[in-house]
Amino acid sequence: FNKFGKARLYYEALSFEEQDEIYAYTKRNVLPTLTQMNLKYAISAKNRARTVAGVSILSTMTGRMFHQKCLKSIAATRGVPVVIGTTKFYGGWDDMLRRLIKDVDSPVLMGWDYPKCDRAMPNILRIVSSLVLARKHDSCCSHTDRFYRLANECAQVLSEIVMCGGCYYVKPGGTSSGDATTAFANSVFNICQAVSANVCSLMACNGHKIEDLSIRELQKRLYSNVYRADHVDPAFVSEYYEFLNKHFSMMILSDDGVVCYNSEFASKGYIANISAFQQVLYYQNNVFMSEAKCWVETDIEKGPHEF
């Protein structure tokens, strides 16, 4: 594939009908592909080598055709937590920060870093990201179509064959950095970890010591929805989302994020702080996040340290 140059050539060489045929084929068959690991060549302050995974053009083409509507709508929407596609120029950065700290009482900024994010990501969470990105296809695709698309995605970017240094290996999992949906899937993963940390924090609170009755009620309903319920209650999901949006405002770009949270609530344990994230990463991501990778900024005027 690499003998002929760039991907543009394939898009020009294949007619739209042929591209559609390949796409339709992936809804009833699995196309296993090869991924090539390359050393990244960049000027960097850090003294370390990074690798990028280049996935096959077939995987990229069909994957983009499947996810395009969802990805385009994420990239085109302004004023939402995931800021992929938002410009930082023309006052965009100022706009994002103002939206982040809006309506949060006693605000504090914090950020963190996922160590070895794309290598340590659990396979089930990468699959969940695929499912979340494909959730809008319930009207146009049958269950079989969607299952085959998921199987394709797993065979192409989750546990595919990797060519590295002239040898072939089976990748045990993790996310491929050259996949068409990498940034979006990482954003879903980021939200998943943040919500997990918040759920754990609120569940770990002593219910008898919560003075705020609305939060005590929220904790009780959260408990029954997590441990007792046999179906998802959309009303409660949106209510908890509103609670997090108000007291734990996030700005997300792939695996990077800034949070503006209510420091009073965090000190009482109603929402997550850095230590809650450390715990979640330790048992849900199998990595230890050191304090040096995190930052907390109590002075809102200074803005985030790094994003």
Curated annotation (Swiss-Prot):
Residues annotated as region RdRp Fingers C-ter?
116-174
UniProt KW keywords: Decay of host mRNAs by virus, Eukaryotic host gene expression shutoff by virus, Eukaryotic host translation shutoff by virus, Host gene expression shutoff by virus, Host mRNA suppression by virus, Host-virus interaction, Nucleotide-binding, Nucleotidyltransferase, RNA-binding, RNA-directed RNA polymerase, Transferase, Viral RNA replication
Residues in the active site?
S254, D255, D256
- Report if keyword Oxidoreductase is assigned: no
Report domain Nsp12 RNA-dependent RNA polymerase positions: 1-307
GO molecular function, a single term: RNA-directed RNA polymerase activity
Pfam families, per the entry: RdRP_1
Q: Which GO terms describe its biological process?
A: DNA-templated transcription; symbiont-mediated degradation of host mRNA; symbiont-mediated suppression of host gene expression; viral RNA genome replication; viral translational frameshifting
Q: RdRp Palm N-ter: where is this region?
A: 77-115
| Residues covered by region (RdRp Thumb) | 307
Q: Where is this region: RdRp Palm C-ter?
A: 175-307
Report the catalytic activity.
RNA(n) + a ribonucleoside 5'-triphosphate = RNA(n+1) + diphosphate
Region RdRp Fingers N-ter: list its residue ranges: 1-76
Which residues belong to any copy of the RdRp catalytic domain?
A: 107-269
Q: What is its EC number?
A: 2.7.7.48
State the protein's purpose: The replicase polyprotein of coronaviruses is a multifunctional protein: it contains the activities necessary for the transcription of negative stranded RNA, leader RNA, subgenomic mRNAs and progeny virion RNA as well as proteinases responsible for the cleavage of the polyprotein into functional products. Non-structural protein 1: binds to the 40S ribosomal subunit and inhibits host translation. The nsp1-40S ribosome complex further induces an endonucleolytic cleavage near the 5'UTR of host mRNAs, targeting them for degradation. By suppressing host gene expression, nsp1 facilitates efficient viral gene expression in infected cells and evasion from host immune response.
Q: Which family, according to UniProt?
A: Belongs to the coronaviruses polyprotein 1ab family.
This protein's name: Replicase polyprotein 1ab
Lineage summary:
Viruses, Riboviria, Orthornavirae, Pisuviricota, Pisoniviricetes
Q: Which gene encodes it?
A: rep
